Swiss-Prot record:
Residues 355-374 are annotated as: Disordered. The chain crosses the membrane at residues 155-175, 319-339. Pfam families: Baculo_E56 (PF04639). InterPro entries: Baculo_ODV-E56. Keywords: Glycoprotein, Late protein, Membrane, Transmembrane, Transmembrane helix, Viral envelope protein, Virion. It is found in: Virion membrane. Structural protein that is specific for occlusion-derived virus (ODV) envelopes but not of budded virus (BV). Belongs to the baculoviridae E56 family. This is Occlusion-derived virus envelope protein E56. It is a multi-pass membrane protein. GO terms for cellular component: membrane; viral envelope; virion membrane. Expressed late in infection (18 hours post-infection). It remains detectable up to 120 hours p.i. Glycans are attached at residue 183.
Length: 374
């Protein structure tokens, strides 16, 4: 069996510690280099009532659950991987890519979309909206995004989102198209990877989705025909019993394999193939939609005034080296001129202002007759 198959097998609650130790030995046989320093120190957390959560003791005596190990390695959460597996190298982290491809693990691409959406909402708070007014305002503040989506609407090309909903362009306005797509997101999803995990097929698990958007159109959403883990109807209907969003802060139950086993959100997926998973996706905001579609590069100020200003700035930037050269030449010429005026013109002026020296020749000597002298 593969690494992710064996890792998935220990993502559950055990009746005793010994059973986990046995399964972990099989996991170690398929563990790639760089990860054994943690996985060879198995431990459990006693949940009471004959229930034990499997996990591992880190060098700082911190306990990390098998569910968390599954989550960070399946989703390629590199910062968390480095935090747990101290001293691991880039090639060792990269070795997981091939292992994910072998088992069609889809989590990494979904993690990228989610992380990108979070970054969009943090950097561009105006996109963290779900209302028509908020979406319209955000589009006006990000005209490049608006222009791109208007072009997509004109082309009439629909896009499949991570949660199985579609962004289609059939409403009267772009804002209406976006709002309809946002309304159709949020819930518990059964996800199956293919093409090395690059492609993911997702469908909505209605019985695990405890709060849907009131405007969700289920005819536009892929709904799972059956639950992949539970076939008993009464058991499925009981999942959302007593649900309270204000307390639980999520729209799902039994949809998070890495959740605390004592919480209503935990689900045991150890029987699923490694290329399959159940996950909760919270209702999208505009920022989540942008991150899902990978359009974050179109964000930023460049409105009509901005475009004109940016255009002028672009021309100025191109001419700036020439302007500096001309300025330097003119400055040098001015310096030379001032030096010339001081040394040459200034010296001539001093001579002119001095009183002139007139050399008068002495009078000629004339011999006069004595009579003329009388």
């Amino acid at each position: 069996m593969s690494f992710f198959t064996n890792l998935r097998r220990v993502n559950k609650v055990y009746p005793d510690s010994a059973s986990f130790i046995v399964d972990n030995r099989l996991l170690l046989n398929t563990t790639p280099a760089g990860f054994t320093n943690v996985l060879n120190v198995p431990s459990t957390r006693n949940l009471g009532n004959g229930r034990f959560e499997p996990g591992y003791n880190l060098s700082n005596n911190q306990f990390v659950s098998a569910g968390d190990i599954n989550r960070i390695t399946r989703s390629n959460d590199v910062p968390r991987i480095r935090g747990v597996f101290q001293g691991i190298s880039d090639p060792q982290i990269g070795s997981l890519n091939q292992l994910r491809r072998v088992d069609n693990v889809p989590d990494a691409n979904l993690h990228v979309k989610r992380t990108r959406g979070d970054a969009v909402k943090q950097s561009f708070p105006e996109t963290n909206v779900r209302s028509a007014e908020g979406v319209d305002r955000a589009l006006q503040q990000n005209p490049r995004l608006n222009t791109y989506l208007q072009g997509a609407k004109a082309a009439g090309v629909g896009v499949l989102l991570a949660g199985g909903a579609y962004l289609t362009f059939s409403a009267a306005t772009l804002v209406q198209d976006i709002i309809r797509a946002l309304n159709n997101t949020g819930g518990s999803y059964y996800v199956r990877g293919s093409d090395g995990g690059e492609t993911a097929d997702a469908c909505l698990l209605l019985h695990r989705t405890c709060q849907r958007d009131p405007n969700m159109n289920t005819s536009e959403v892929a709904i799972c025909a059956n639950d992949p883990l539970v076939s008993n109807t009464a058991q499925l209907q009981a999942i959302c019993s007593g649900f309270n969003y204000e307390q639980e802060q999520t729209v799902c139950r039994q949809s998070d394999p890495a959740a605390d086993p004592d919480s209503p959100q935990f689900v045991d997926v150890s029987d699923l193939l490694p290329g399959q998973t159940i996950m909760c996706i919270e209702p999208y905001s505009l920022g989540d939609l942008i991150g899902d579609l990978g359009l974050d590069h179109l964000l930023g100020e460049e409105g009509l005034v901005g475009k004109s200003s940016n255009s002028s700035d672009s021309v100025s930037n191109k001419l700036m080296p020439l302007i500096w050269l001309i300025g330097a030449v003119l400055f040098l010429a001015l310096v030379v001129y001032l030096i010339y005026r001081f040394l040459i013109k200034g010296g001539g002026s001093s001579t002119t202002n001095a009183p002139p020296v007139v050399i008068v020749p002495p009078p000629a000597t004339t011999n006069l007759n004595p009579q003329q002298q009388i």
